């Protein structure tokens, strides 16, 4: 099913050597990506979904073009920018809530299942990862694939930072598969 393919794509990302770099870059649209050797937390999700044929760059840009006012205004922009919008955690949080499912934020590990998307605040910085079907060493929770600066990695870090968002997104026309 979808979740199995998405989490396999996320786990596959951990085999890539990626230098953490969120610098603005001009990229093609649609289907654009920064060079494969660089990336940030959002690129783990963008590349995982793209492996399933879902272009978050296009999906986010089209939604922002249609509903720009519902997206955060943190960057002083007056219109969507397809080079960077899909690489910003706050934009993805809005997109996933609008086109997927926003789930309750809890401190119960049983509420976070493979395929779920989780956002945290790491100090003042937003962060995003994907829950995968690999249990923590104590079996208490699923682990997360994310990139917090060391490249894409599998880590038992679900509750290491304050959880601020919890989502599911199964692609365009998400039918809560």
Language-model features: where?
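N-terminal capping segments
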Residues: 1-95, 101
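Intrinsically disordered, low-complexity N-terminal regions enriched in serine/proline/glycine
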Residues: 19, 23, 48, 111, ...
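Low-complexity, Gly/Ser/Thr/Pro-rich intrinsically disordered linker/tail segments
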Residues: 139-177
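Acidic helix/loop microenvironments that form the catalytic cleft of cell-wall polysaccharide enzymes
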Residues: 38, 120, 148-150
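A structural signal for short, hydrophobic beta-strand segments that form beta-sheets
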Residues: 56-57, 131, 162-165
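A generic structural signal for short, solvent-exposed coil/turn residues
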Residues: 48, 121-123, 136, 158-161
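...with weaker cross-activation on analogous glycine-rich loops/strands in unrelated enzymes
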Residues: 65-145
């Amino acid at each position: 099913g979808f979740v199995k393919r998405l989490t396999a794509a996320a786990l596959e990302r951990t085999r890539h050597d990626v230098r953490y770099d969120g610098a603005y870059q001009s990229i093609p649209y649609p289907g654009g990506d920064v060079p494969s050797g660089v990336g940030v937390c959002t690129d783990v999700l963008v590349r995982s979904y793209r492996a399933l044929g879902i272009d978050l760059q296009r999906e986010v840009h089209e939604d922002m073009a249609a509903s720009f006012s519902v997206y955060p205004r943190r960057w002083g922009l007056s219109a969507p920018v397809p080079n960077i919008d899909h690489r910003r955690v706050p934009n993805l949080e809005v997109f996933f809530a609008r086109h997927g499912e926003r789930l309750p934020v809890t401190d119960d590990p049983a509420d976070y299942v493979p395929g779920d998307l989780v956002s945290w605040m790491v100090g003042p910085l937003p962060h995003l990862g994907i829950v995968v079907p690999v249990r923590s060493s104590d079996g208490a929770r699923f682990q997360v694939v994310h990139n917090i600066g060391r490249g894409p990695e599998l880590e038992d870090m679900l509750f290491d930072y304050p959880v601020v968002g919890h989502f599911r997104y199964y692609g365009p026309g998400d039918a809560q598969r």
